[in-house]
């Protein structure tokens, strides 16, 4: 019987209407009179309002309509206290008090009977009580009133219940209301106390049973109906309700509603959680607050809980309460005891373990175990309560622990307990095991195992012979223990409840009887369930492993049905195991599968499959993509692949074997399918999982080898499984995993497995249905390819059925498909799948073939259109064409259409990128909507061709769509344009948007009238205006939507935005552009709509972007300003004034263009570094510089645009613009000199010329001042030395050139005006501008002759005028327009006016080279000169200036004014200057600097040691040795104690390491293994002391040594070796540029017997070139690694990381360099190869130029390295300048450029990569030429060192000549181009490589 509160009887239309009216009338008191009137109309239909005697209201039978009114009133609680009190007094209380005796009309009574509802009296009482409870909860002041009503109610019930059954029915409804709604705590407590007193009176319960059993009035239909429904009215039922109310109240007080468990389980869990925290094993997810709240609630109600527990103990101790007279009463009695036990579980939380109450609780639980635990009549709730109570006690006492552990297996073995109950009880039992040691649970599991027993013949063993013997208390459970209060009232069959069959009797039965077998099956099922539940909930690896071990042993030892139970349980346990245990479990399943297959045990095999499916479902649902998941997936796939393994490949096999293996494979299909997502869900993502991808492919190959084909019986039987597998499978061939060796299909071992002739024939027939016989020629096509095609047909056809037809295209990306000549088959298959997909859509299910899934398929096809593989791209275009024409609606979806438009944008961006980053192209482009990344090859021609092709196809496809669904498509296009608003605000070109606009405006046949229009004229008409108006409406609608709030709300939001932005600025936080954009949009909207204060809004609209001062914020702001000026012209002047003010303030603040923070230092002043070319760092710094200056560019463009728009509008505006222009250009003297500042400067000057032109036309007084400031501002740029354009962004350089030309032309137009006001200054400016234009143009096209270039010869008067203007300008002008005559004039001017030039370091050379100087005094002015570069300063120590103290003093001053780290680099040069140090200046410099930098002192000492001897053996002393020894001794003696300790630690450590070479000498002729053993032995002895470092790595500290890294190097007489050290150092983060500490392993070579000083010099020069090129952002790559000479013939060399020499490649059998690249990076079409080739080109160009200039010889393959990124690196510089090995000049070529190098670049001098190499060589050469003197200054001091590479000053002459200083830049470019041509495959290069092969065995 249902206890329904919604009452079907009152669900009539009238009842619903009354309920609705009641809710409205008791709702919010907006119209109190109206509500009151309605309520009165409803309630006054009740008899209580019209009866003459309301005290007899119960005598009037309650009708259906009155019932509906009363229940409706009870549902709606009034919102006012007065109304509640009125209803309570007038209606609720009177009817409530009369419910015990209320009469019911026959109609109402019969309706309830028909509907099988409870008695109307019970339900009416329930509703009225619920009303009072909720009213008291809402208005606690009613507590006393309602409490009084309830007291009166109890009194009436006690009077009436013996007379009328309605009294008991009413009481049942009353109690149930409080059970369901204990929300009013105090009222529920009050009621519980009343009921407790009632039942404690034993007479009440006795009287109830007496009346029910004997009274004639209590035998009507209602009593029978309650009995039949299982709710027999009895004292047991009332007691159960009261006990349930008690539990409900406690649960409410403890707030257990969020848990969902019963009370005892909740209390047990809380104790467990507390235990975990106490033991410090709590999980991170555990909620401590819940535990704290729980204990707080317990403490708050302690006394009340104590009273409850005492009453519960009283009831539990009275055994006579148990009423077993009927099934229902027995159930109520046991449930009552369960509720009281749940209550008693509070005792451990409120009492000490020593208390009497706790002791009583323990006894009650013990007694319950003895009496009820194994009884066959108790309810599951009592069993759970007993187990929960005993488990809880385990946390506090061990008294019952042993009993519970012993009894639990017997409980599980009980024949009357269900498996469901066992599962529930086992969970509770497991929780109670945690405070015990692990032995307890092990013991329990073994006890379970003992129950799983079978006899020798496999029959079940009687496991319980005498149960009494195992019960700890020794008491017997007999039926006589339960006294029947009234046996005469027992129903038939009650005796069966008593379980009078003893265990002994059961044991004596025939073990093979049917009953026993049934019991045994139940026993096994329960034991397995309990064991697995315990293991999974205890969740420790040891217990899980034990459980699995026990259960696996039982398989095949019992019945087949029970095998299924055990296997199923093992499967459910599997996801909780470790990887190791799971692996063992899989092996078990595998072994059982083998056994089942071998003995043909289909039942066992079926059970195994079911168990595997359970594992699959569990892993899919709860552990998807976990390690366990993939282990199981791999196991299933491996099992499929291993099926049918053969020893001999390509061997014929019989059809019977093929069929048998096919059936074997089929057993794995269901578990595999269950493990994978079903079609329609997101498929398994294994795009980057090489192992899983290959396993899936091999599985499909094995399918077809063993007879799986479409239409075959085995495929039909397993089609649903194959469908899911196919849906998640990768394509059988693709570019992943990268198959660099291009292995053919013939090499796949699975495809080469033999098959039967019948299967091969069937597979051929299958593929013939797709491919005609011409494509698949049986005789020429191998069986491997046949099987591959068959597998592809099978997989892709089934995948198509699963809703995916797009994967076939990916086959073309695999080189083996193209090389295997089956690409035509794949093309046919691809088309077939698309056509099949189009057919399936018509009849497919919506889950797979809905519009989104169809659009997704097209989306996948569209993404292939940009693939670099031509065959795949062609197939993709063909596939898209068919797909869109077959299913036009597929493109009418934002997913596919947006992808198409985004791809157009991405490809257009890629073309821009190839211009902007010619030598460093982007390969990855992200589609803006889907965020999908597409890979684009570096070829600019490919990019342009692909865009053109896609654009053409896209037009056709969108035309088709517009003709089919014109309006829908245009709405999508509008959405696309609107969605990209954020991008388009910052990006100038969005090709996809442009395309969308074009297509939306087309007139198509869908436009019935316009398409038939006859038009004339050059332009076709379009519908773009209608589209734009619709789009404008849509934008306006969005705009209006954004401002639907009131102006006050918007103002408040604006205030919050400005406050947040300024707060973040103050705190130095990054400002998000969107925040600024949102603020500007809101403020502009408010301003334009006229709802705000204009002045205040304009102030913020202008000032905030300037305060944020980012490129994005100012770009958006300038657009907003122009919008305001257009839409709100009355405030335009106000806004312009504010912009002008902020512009000038930003100039005063020295930010943006007017900041010098990003200026580049001169190359010679920069810190030289031994590190790889850092293009990422260069780009980062360049980006920072550009972004810092861009804001001013946007403002300048705003000025220029608005100036042109308001020309001649007013004098006031002209004055404002003039003021802005003047302030900007007059401050250009302090503006940035970064290369990126040039264009912005010239934009400003162009704006100024516009203002000048306007002023000239209006005759303004500012003409003269503007002219002068323009000239001065323009000339301020040329104070920087001439430099090539920065970076490789040709678009930027071309724009720079364009702006400079525009400025030059604009000034020429104003030449008369400029000449009149500026005189020669204007002419000087013309020289500079012409030179600048030529410089930029030359850089863009160095080999093309520029008309009029180098024609501006300087005259003497121009030189003099420029010198008078600024000596620095004169020097820079000479550098640009050199002539000997002009130089002589300038030298004279510098000598004559030396003090004017002291601020210009570059003027010093001119000053000291004057031939007219006759005495020292003439050079006294040098003492005032600005410091020059460290190299120049060092060169002033050379003999030429040794006699001039002014020069020597200046050089000391100049060096000391520099950072010591700059001088650090030039230690070799400084040491060599000691040769000429007659005055001691150099010695003093060294000693003074050593005091400042201890690292400098160490480097000096090592270099001095290396220069003491002329020979490598340290025998022939150098004449400088005494000087070096003296200085070294003085230096060391001057060290402080800490410096001396550091010095001793460092040199001792280094001596220990280098000393290994000496200890290796006795092993020189021994094997490498013996040498290595000796090195490792010595390395193990070295102690790493604090702060020690390698001499080659002074900026890092050695923290560890790889003691086993020692490696002897090849040498005939010496013992060099290599070792690896762990270095800790600070490096720059490539992204942020900030220093971060890293630890890395660094290998170093300790060389003996070779003079390393030449290598040091060569690497110094390479580092200098690196700095020169990085200063202009040139895209070349060099790696000046570190070499330090530490003693005669000794040195430390850093090993290039991740590199291998070319000769080692030859030794490793790599045929050529190109083959190495393809094997390592993939074929030429891969992005990896293209990136590596790009790196190769850049590095080869850099080293080629250096090789020529420094004359690197001995360039055999042993001295050329290749790193893992494709860079070509040079090492070993023993032969440079004027020395060649052995005097043999085989290498009479500029540099090494072999055929294999050219092959990597494309194979010929016409390929793009080769042309890039040529261009980079030319630009690297041009960039180096202006720094020839710096390079010579680095070499000059070393000439006296005695190094063999020098031939005196001839070396310097030759070096200078290689720079071709006499040639123009254009001539020098042609010269370098000729050198490249000469080097390409020179016969000398080939001859030298052959010489090295013959003499040293170095391959080439």
UniProtKB/Swiss-Prot annotation:
Using the UniProt annotation, give all residue ranges assigned to the region (Pleckstrin homology (PH) domain conferring phosphoinositide binding specificity).
1531-1648
Query: Sorted alphabetically, which InterPro entries does this protein's record hold?
Result: ARM-type_fold, Kinase-like_dom_sf, PI3/4_kinase_cat_dom, PI3/4_kinase_cat_sf, PI3/4_kinase_CS, PI3K_accessory_dom, PI3K_accessory_sf, PI4K_N
Q: What Gene Ontology terms describe where this protein resides (cellular component)?
A: cytoplasm; mitochondrion; plasma membrane
EC number(s): the record gives: 2.7.1.67
Entry's SMART domains? Answer: PI3Ka, PI3Kc
Ranges where the record places region Catalytic loop: 1751-1759
**Which residue ranges does the record annotate as region Activation loop?**
1770-1794
| Annotated positions of the Phosphoserine modification | 459
Q: Does Ribosomal protein appear among the keywords? A: no
What reaction(s) does this enzyme catalyze? a 1,2-diacyl-sn-glycero-3-phospho-(1D-myo-inositol) + ATP = a 1,2-diacyl-sn-glycero-3-phospho-(1D-myo-inositol 4-phosphate) + ADP + H(+)
Query: What is any one GO biological process for this UniProt entry?
Result: macroautophagy
* Residue ranges annotated for the PI3K/PI4K catalytic domain, each copy included: 1617-1884
MF annotations from Gene Ontology: 1-phosphatidylinositol 4-kinase activity; ATP binding
**Region listing for G-loop, in residue ranges:** 1623-1629
Keywords attached to this entry: ATP-binding, Kinase, Nucleotide-binding, Phosphoprotein, Transferase
Pfam families tied to this protein? PI3_PI4_kinase (PF00454), PI3Ka (PF00613), PI4K_N (PF19274)
Question: Which residue ranges does the record assign to the PIK helical domain?
Answer: 1345-1530
Return the similarity comment: Belongs to the PI3/PI4-kinase family. Type III PI4K subfamily.
Extra information: Present with 846 molecules/cell in log phase SD medium.
- The name this protein carries in UniProt is Phosphatidylinositol 4-kinase STT4
């Amino acid at each position: 019987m249902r206890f329904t509160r919604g009452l079907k009887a009152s669900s009539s239309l009238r009842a619903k209407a009354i309920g609705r009216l009641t809710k409205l009338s008791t709702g919010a008191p907006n119209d109190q009179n109206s509500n009151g009137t309605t309520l009165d109309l409803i309630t006054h239909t009740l008899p209580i309002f019209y009866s003459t005697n309301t005290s007899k209201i119960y005598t009037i039978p309650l009708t259906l309509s009155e019932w509906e009114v009363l229940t409706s009133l009870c549902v709606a609680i009034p919102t006012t206290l007065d109304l509640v009190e009125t209803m309570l007094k007038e209606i609720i209380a009177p009817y409530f008090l009369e419910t015990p005796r209320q009469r019911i009309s026959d109609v109402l009574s019969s309706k309830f009977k028909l509907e099988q509802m409870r008695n109307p009296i019970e339900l009416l009482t329930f509703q009225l009580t619920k009303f009072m409870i909720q009213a008291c909860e809402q208005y606690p002041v009613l507590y006393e009133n309602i409490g009084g009503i309830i007291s009166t109610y109890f009194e009436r019930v006690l009077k009436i219940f013996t007379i009328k059954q309605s009294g008991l029915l009413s009481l049942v409804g009353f109690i149930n209301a409080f059970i369901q709604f204990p929300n009013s705590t105090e009222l529920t407590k009050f009621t519980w106390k009343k009921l407790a007193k009632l039942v404690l009176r034993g007479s009440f319960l006795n009287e109830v049973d007496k009346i029910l059993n004997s009274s004639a009035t209590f035998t009507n239909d209602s009593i029978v109906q309650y009995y039949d429904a299982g709710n027999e009215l009895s004292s047991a039922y009332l007691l159960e309700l009261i006990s349930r109310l008690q539990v409900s109240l406690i649960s409410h007080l403890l707030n257990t509603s969020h848990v969902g468990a019963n009370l005892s389980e909740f209390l047990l869990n809380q104790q467990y959680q507390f235990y975990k925290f106490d033991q410090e094993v709590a999980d991170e997810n555990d909620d401590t607050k819940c535990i704290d709240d729980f204990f707080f609630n317990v403490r708050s109600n302690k006394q009340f809980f104590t009273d409850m527990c005492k009453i519960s103990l009283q009831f539990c101790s009275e055994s006579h309460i148990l009423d077993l007279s009927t099934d229902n009463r027995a159930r109520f009695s046991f449930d009552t005891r369960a509720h009281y036990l749940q209550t008693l579980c509070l005792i451990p939380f409120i009492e000490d373990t020593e208390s009497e109450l706790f002791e009583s609780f323990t006894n009650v639980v013990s007694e319950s175990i003895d009496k009820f635990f194994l009884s066959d009549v108790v309810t599951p709730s009592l069993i759970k309560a007993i187990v929960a109570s005993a488990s809880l006690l385990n946390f506090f006492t061990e008294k019952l622990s042993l009993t519970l552990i012993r009894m639990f297996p017997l409980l599980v073995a009980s024949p009357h307990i269900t498996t469901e109950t066992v599962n529930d009880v086992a969970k509770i039992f497991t929780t109670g095991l945690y405070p015990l040691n692990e032995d307890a649970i092990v013991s329990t599991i073994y006890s379970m195992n003992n129950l799983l027993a079978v006899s020798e013949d496999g029959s079940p063993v009687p496991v319980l012979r005498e149960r009494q013997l195992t019960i700890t208390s020794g008491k017997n459970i007999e039926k006589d223990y339960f006294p029947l209060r009234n046996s005469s009232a027992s129903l038939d069959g009650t005796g069966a409840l008593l379980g009078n069959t003893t265990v002994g009797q059961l044991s004596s039965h025939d073990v093979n009887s049917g009953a026993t077998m049934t019991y045994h099956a139940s026993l096994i099922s329960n034991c397995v369930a309990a064991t697995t539940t315990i293991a999974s909930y205890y969740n420790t690896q040891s217990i899980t492993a034990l459980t699995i071990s026990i259960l696996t042993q039982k398989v095949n030892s019992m019945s087949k049905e029970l095998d299924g139970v055990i296997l199923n349980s093992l499967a459910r346990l599997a996801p909780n195991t470790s990887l190791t245990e799971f692996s063992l479990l899989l092996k078990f399943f595998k072994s059982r599968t083998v056994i089942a297959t071998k003995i043909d045990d289909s039942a066992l095999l079926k059970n195994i499959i079911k168990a595997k499916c359970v594992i699959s479902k569990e892993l899919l649902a709860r552990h998807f993509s976990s390690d366990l998941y993939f282990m199981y997936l791999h196991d299933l796939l491996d099992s499929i692949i291993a099926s049918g393994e053969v020893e001999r490949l390509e061997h014929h096999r019989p059809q019977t074997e093929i069929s048998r293996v096919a059936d074997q494979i089929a057993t794995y299909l269901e578990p595999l399918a269950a493990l994978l997502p079903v079609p329609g869900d997101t498929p398994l993502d294994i795009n980057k999982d090489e192992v899983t991808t290959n396993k899936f492919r091999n599985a499909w190959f094995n399918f077809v080898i063993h007879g799986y084909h479409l239409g075959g019986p085995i495929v039909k039987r397993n089609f649903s499984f194959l469908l899911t597998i196919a849906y998640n499978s990768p394509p059988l061939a693709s570019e992943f995993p990268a198959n660099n060796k291009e292995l053919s299909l013939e090499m796949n071992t699975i495809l080469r497995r033999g098959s039967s002739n019948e299967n091969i024939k069937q597979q051929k027939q299958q593929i013939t249905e797709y491919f005609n016989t011409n494509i698949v020629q049986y005789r020429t096509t191998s069986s491997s390819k046949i099987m591959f095609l068959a597998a592809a047909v099978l997989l892709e056809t089934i995948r198509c059925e699963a809703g995916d037809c797009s994967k076939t295209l990916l086959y073309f990306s695999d080189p083996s498909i193209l090389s295997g000549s089956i690409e035509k088959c794949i093309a046919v298959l691809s088309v077939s799948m698309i056509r099949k997909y189009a057919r399936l859509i018509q009849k497919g299910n919506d889950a797979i073939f809905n519009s989104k899934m169809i659009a997704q398929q097209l989306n996948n096809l569209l993404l292939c259109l940009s693939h670099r593989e031509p065959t795949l791209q062609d197939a993709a275009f063909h596939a898209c064409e068919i797909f869109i024409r077959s299913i036009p609606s597929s493109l009418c979806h934002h997913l596919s259409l947006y992808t198409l438009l985004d791809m157009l944008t991405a490809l257009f961006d890629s073309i821009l990128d190839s211009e902007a980053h010619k030598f460093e192209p982007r390969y990855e482009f992200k589609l803006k909507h889907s965020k999908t990344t597409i890979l684009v090859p570096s070829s600019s021609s490919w990019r342009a061709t692909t865009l053109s092709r896609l654009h053409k196809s896209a037009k056709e496809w969108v035309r088709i769509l517009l003709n089919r669904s014109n309006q829908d498509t245009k709405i999508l296009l509008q959405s696309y344009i609107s969605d990209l608003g954020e991008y388009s605000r910052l990006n100038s070109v969005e090709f996809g948007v442009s395309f969308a606009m074009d297509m939306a405006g087309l007139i198509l046949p869908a436009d019935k009238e316009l398409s038939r229009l006859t038009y004339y004229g050059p332009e076709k008409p379009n519908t773009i205006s209608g589209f734009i108006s619709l789009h404008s409406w849509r934008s306006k609608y969005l705009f209006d939507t954004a401002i639907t709030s009131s102006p006050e709300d918007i103002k408040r939001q604006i205030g919050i935005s400005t406050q947040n932005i300024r707060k973040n600025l103050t705190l130095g936080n990054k400002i998000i552009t969107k925040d600024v954009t949102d603020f500007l949009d809101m403020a502009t909207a408010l301003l334009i709509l006229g709802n705000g204060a204009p002045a205040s809004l304009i102030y913020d609209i202008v000032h905030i972007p300037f305060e944020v001062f980012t490129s994005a914020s100012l770009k958006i702001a300038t657009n907003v300003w122009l919008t305001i000026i257009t839409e709100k012209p009355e405030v335009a002047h106000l806004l312009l004034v504010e912009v002008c003010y902020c512009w000038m303030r930003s100039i005063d603040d020295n930010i943006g263009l007017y900041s010098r923070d990003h200026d580049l230092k001169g190359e010679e002043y920069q810190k030289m570094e031994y590190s790889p070319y850092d293009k990422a760092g260069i780009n980062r710094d360049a980006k920072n510089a550009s972004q810092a200056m861009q804001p001013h560019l946007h403002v300048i463009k705003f000025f220029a645009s608005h100036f042109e728009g308001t020309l001649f509008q007013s004098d006031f505006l002209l004055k404002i613009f003039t003021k802005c222009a003047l302030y900007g250009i007059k401050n250009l003297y302090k503006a940035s000199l970064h290369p990126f500042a040039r264009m912005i400067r010239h934009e400003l000057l162009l704006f100024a010329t516009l203002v000048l032109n306007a002023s000239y036309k209006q005759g303004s007084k500012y003409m003269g001042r503007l002219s002068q400031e323009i000239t001065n501002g323009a000339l301020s740029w040329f104070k920087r030395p001439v430099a090539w354009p920065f970076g490789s962004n040709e678009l930027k350089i071309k724009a720079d050139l364009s702006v400079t030309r525009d400025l030059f032309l604009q000034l020429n137009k104003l030449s008369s005006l400029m000449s009149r006001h500026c005189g020669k200054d204007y002419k000087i400016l013309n020289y500079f501008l012409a030179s600048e234009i030529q410089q930029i143009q030359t850089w863009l096209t160095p080999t093309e002759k520029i008309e009029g270039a180098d024609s501006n010869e300087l005259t003497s008067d121009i030189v003099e005028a420029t010198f008078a203007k600024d000596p620095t300008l004169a020097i820079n002008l000479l550098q640009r327009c050199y002539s000997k005559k002009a130089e002589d004039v300038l030298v004279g001017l510098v000598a004559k006016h030396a003090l004017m030039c002291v601020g210009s370091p570059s003027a010093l050379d001119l000053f000291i080279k004057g031939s007219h100087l006759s005495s020292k005094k003439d050079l006294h002015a040098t003492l005032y000169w600005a410091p020059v570069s460290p190299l120049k300063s060092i060169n002033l120590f050379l003999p030429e200036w040794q006699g001039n103290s002014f020069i020597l003093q200046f050089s000391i001053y100049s060096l000391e004014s520099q950072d010591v780290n700059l001088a650090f680099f030039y230690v070799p040069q400084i040491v060599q200057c000691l040769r000429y140090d007659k005055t001691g200046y150099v010695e003093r410099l060294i000693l003074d600097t050593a005091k400042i930098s201890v690292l400098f002192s160490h480097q000096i000492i090592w270099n001095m040691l290396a220069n003491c001897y002329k020979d490598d053996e340290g025998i022939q002393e150098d004449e400088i040795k005494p000087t070096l020894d003296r200085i070294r001794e003085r230096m060391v003696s001057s060290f402080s104690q800490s410096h001396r300790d550091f010095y001793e630690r460092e040199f001792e450590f280094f001596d220990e390491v280098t000393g290994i070479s000496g200890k290796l000498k006795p092993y020189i002729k021994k094997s490498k293994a013996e040498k290595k053993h000796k090195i490792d032995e010595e390395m193990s002895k070295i102690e790493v002391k604090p702060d020690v470092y390698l001499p080659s790595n002074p900026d890092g500290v050695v923290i560890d040594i790889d003691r086993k890294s020692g490696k002897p190097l090849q040498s005939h007489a010496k013992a060099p070796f290599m070792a690896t050290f762990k270095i800790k150092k600070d490096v720059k983060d490539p992204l942020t540029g900030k220093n971060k500490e890293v630890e890395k392993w660094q290998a170093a070579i300790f060389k003996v017997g070779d003079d390393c000083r030449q290598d040091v010099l060569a690497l110094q020069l390479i580092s200098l070139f690196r700095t020169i090129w990085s200063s202009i952002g040139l895209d070349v790559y060099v790696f000046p690694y570190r070499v330090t000479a530490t003693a005669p013939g000794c040195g430390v060399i850093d090993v290039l990381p991740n590199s291998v020499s070319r000769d080692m490649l030859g030794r490793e059998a790599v045929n050529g360099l190109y083959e190495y690249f393809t094997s390592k990076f993939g074929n030429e079409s891969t992005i990896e190869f293209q990136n590596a080739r790009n790196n190769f080109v850049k590095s080869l160009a850099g080293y080629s130029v250096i090789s020529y200039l420094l004359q690197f010889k001995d360039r055999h393959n042993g001295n050329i390295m290749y790193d893992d990124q494709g860079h070509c690196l040079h090492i070993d510089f023993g032969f440079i300048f004027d020395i060649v090995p052995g005097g043999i000049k085989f290498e009479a070529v500029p540099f090494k450029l072999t055929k294999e190098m050219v092959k990597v670049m494309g194979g010929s001098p016409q390929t793009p990569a080769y042309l890039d190499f040529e261009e980079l060589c030319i630009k690297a050469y041009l960039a180096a030429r202006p720094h020839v003197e710096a390079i010579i200054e680095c070499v000059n001091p070393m000439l006296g060192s005695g190094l063999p590479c020098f031939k005196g000053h001839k070396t310097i002459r030759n070096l200078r000549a290689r720079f071709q200083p006499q040639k123009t830049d254009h001539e020098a470019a042609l010269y370098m181009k000729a050198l490249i041509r000469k080097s390409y495959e020179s016969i000398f290069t080939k001859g030298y490589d052959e010489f090295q092969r013959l003499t040293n065995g170095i391959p080439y």
